[in-house]
Amino acid sequence: MILPGGFLLLVLLAAASTSQIVWAAEKSAKLATVRIGYVSRSILDMPYIIARDRGFFREEGLEPELIFMKAAQTIPAMLAGGIDFGSATGTGIAAAVSGVDVRLIFALTDRPSFDLIAVPSITSVQQLRGKKLGTSGVGSLAEILARQILIANKIPLEQVTFLPFGTSDVTYVALKAGTIDATMLQIPQKFFAVDEGFRNLASGADVYRAVMGGLTTTKNTINDRPELVSKTIRATMRAVRLVKNDKNYVLGFMKGPHLDLSGERARFAERVYDATMQLYLSSHTVDETLQREMIAIASQRVKPAQPVPPERVFDFSFVQKVTATLR
């Protein structure tokens, strides 16, 4: 039977459409889910969002799920299998030093962007005696930095009340509400605070070098799913490369909904970008000297029974392998 030309065309179009749907479904079914718990709406977690939006994860065969959570929640979530990776590096290092079987596998920066910001009436670190200081959580990088600043200024830690609030945007709200007297704020919140009249008392980078921003995961994930680790790192590194090489794209991204840049995104975007370029590492690893320094600082609080070697906390082997193949 000979079909009319118009009807035949409709049949062919329907068949082609069906084939495309089936092909797309099969492709989607082949993607492996990767769940990343990220802890800030800042430049430290920007690469994961860019990697998702630009399709870098999907090009690695991964379907990303980015889950916003508190720093203290990342380790329990990883151990329970709720997420594969966490971006709270300070929390991850403290957990590893305490004996939890996790590793830091990717470093975004090696200098903290946190500054100690206080209410306008406090003009020096010495005036924090008897005051309330908000941090993101017990053992977090923000808390470690705050403690190091107090120690450097010879203030006994017991003379300051530490209150865990969660992410920087939450502690910033608490600072503005007068619930706390000071807190550690990172980019971009520290820019907002200073512009609004709050005091910048000290820089975390002046007292402490540390990995800030990056990825942690469990030893089981490293052993059982090495391809997932490599692909996640490769997608992230591609996003970092894009950030460094395409300023116009990143400025547009910063003016979108993903970063916490208050209501004046256009005014802050370029300022934040310039600060980002000064912080992002090229190697995404840190040397053994810094690794041991970070372990020593974490050990002051965690107090492990035995000395902790760097390989018990850090594993940059995947970054090194990906770097060798990424062009």
Please place each PLM-identified region on the residue numbering.
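A bilobed periplasmic-binding-protein/Venus flytrap-type ligand-binding module shared by bacterial periplasmic
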Residues: 50-51, 114-123, 212-228, 279-282
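Conserved C-terminal helix/tail region of periplasmic/extracytoplasmic solute-binding proteins
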Residues: 295-327
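Pocket-lining segment of extracytoplasmic ligand-binding domains
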Residues: 91, 169-260
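Short, glycine-/small- and polar/acidic-enriched structural segments
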Residues: 25-177, 181-187, 200-204, 209
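Extracytoplasmic/secreted envelope proteins and their assembly/folding machinery
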Residues: 45, 75, 79, 143, ...
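Bacterial N-terminal signal peptides
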Residues: 4-18
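Secondary-structure end/capping motifs
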Residues: 223-306
